[in-house]
Amino acid sequence: MIKERVKMEVIGLEIPLISGNEEYTLAELISKYPLEENDIIVIAETVVSKSEKNVILKDTIKPSNEAIELSKKLGKEPEVVQVILDESNETVRLGPNFIVTETKHGFVCANSGVDESNTSKGIKPLPKNPDKSANEIRKGIEEITGKKVGVIINDSMGRPFRKGSCGVAIGVSGVCGLWDRKGEKDLFGRELKTTEVGIADELAATASVVMGQSDEGIPLVIIRNAPVPFKEGTGKELIRKKEEDVFR
């Protein structure tokens, strides 16, 4: 016998292009949609960075000698390489046309998350403090709507040992980031000893299927009826400590 157990809804929303000069906040914009209790709102990091005016014009960047030399190896503009270096704590690896860095947030990713996609001009770093941004957006939405919600800021990142980019959570508020299930029982009554679920990453990846990574124009996704814990989480709790990382 087959029976339904869980039905989760994923709703992609088109919004006006964000420039950073709007007379409304992201919370005010998102609240115009009829949200429901325990909706999870996933927002593309591009929208958050642009709304926070975190875009750097190329003519304001003075590349260092290091950036100029690296740009020759990578086939990238020196200005772009300079921003990548500025946004990083350290360089982890050099690829053929990318740099794997640890960002100032602690993320290990290509090019410090810096890109020029879906930005009409300038270079766009990641939001300065994604958890803080997610929290401010969530609190704004809850104040306006009276509904309890979760907010995730997502970005697409490549993965070591697997091809293809995938959505990940870089900022989290109002929903669990890392779901610790140790001590629970499996179907046969055995106690789970090590299970920790990167639930915010799973939600971010789910939203990315609808958002797309090209010209879809869907930077906002509502996930409804998600079977996840609604407790205060962060994106930082998903970052593996350097001393626990066996691949670095």
Swiss-Prot record:
Binding site for a divalent metal cation 1: 115, 155
InterPro entries with a match to the protein in the record: F420-0_g-glutamyl_ligase, F420-0_gamma-glut_ligase-dom, F420_ligase_CofE_arc
Positions bound to a divalent metal cation 2: 156, 213
Pathway(s) annotated for this protein in UniProt: Cofactor biosynthesis; coenzyme F420 biosynthesis
Cross-referenced SUPFAM superfamilies: CofE-like (SSF144010)
Molecular function, one GO term: coenzyme F420-0:L-glutamate ligase activity
Sequence positions that bind GTP: 15-18, 45-46, 50, 118, 211-218
An individual GO BP term: F420-0 metabolic process
UniProt keywords, alphabetically: GTP-binding, Ligase, Magnesium, Manganese, Metal-binding, Nucleotide-binding, Potassium
Top-level taxon in the UniProt lineage: Archaea
Cofactor: Mg(2+); Mn(2+); K(+)
Cofactor binding remark: Binds 2 divalent metal cations per subunit. The ions could be magnesium and/or manganese.
Keyword Endoplasmic reticulum: no
EC number: 6.3.2.31, 6.3.2.34
The keyword Signal is annotated on this UniProt entry: no
Job of this protein: Catalyzes the GTP-dependent successive addition of two or more gamma-linked L-glutamates to the L-lactyl phosphodiester of 7,8-didemethyl-8-hydroxy-5-deazariboflavin (F420-0) to form coenzyme F420-0-glutamyl-glutamate (F420-2) or polyglutamated F420 derivatives.
NCBIfam families xrefs: F420_cofE, PRK13293.1
PANTHER family the UniProt entry points to: COENZYME F420:L-GLUTAMATE LIGASE (PTHR47917:SF1), PTHR47917
Similarity field: Belongs to the CofE family.
Subunit-structure text: Homodimer.
Protein name per UniProt: Coenzyme F420:L-glutamate ligase
Protein species of origin: Methanococcus maripaludis (strain C6 / ATCC BAA-1332)
